[in-house]
Amino acid sequence: MLSAQLKQQLQSIQALQQTLEEETACLKEKNFSQLSAILLKKQKLLQAVTELDKVLSPAKIQDQIAQSEDLLALKNEIEQQLAACQKINALNGRLVELSMKSNNLLMQLIKQATGKNSITYDQKGGLNSASLLGRNIKA
């Protein structure tokens, strides 16, 4: 029974890792249409992992795992997979941060472009702050 529970936990964590990789791809490609479904799937997997961890965490069960080479090997594999998930999740957090900064910068530029003293652009697409769309022309 313990072996089956550990295998189930490993499968859940492997599915979580795959989901995190899908999340990474969505964030890199800025494909936000699929992101909501991926986040829901991620939440369900995290919940399943947490619930099974509660079942497997009592000291009595941990002692049984420690006494069996097979169970201990499964536990070690689970811990390695979990560490990989944590690394991917940290990367995804950084991607979200960078995306938010990029969006904030874009919003500032759009606000400037639509403001009273709008900035114009030169032939190369660069900002040309010298001309404020002819507002100060007297002739």
Where are these regions (language model features)?
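Extended, charge-rich alpha-helical scaffolding segments
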Residues: 1-77, 84-87
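Short terminal interaction segments
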Residues: 74-139
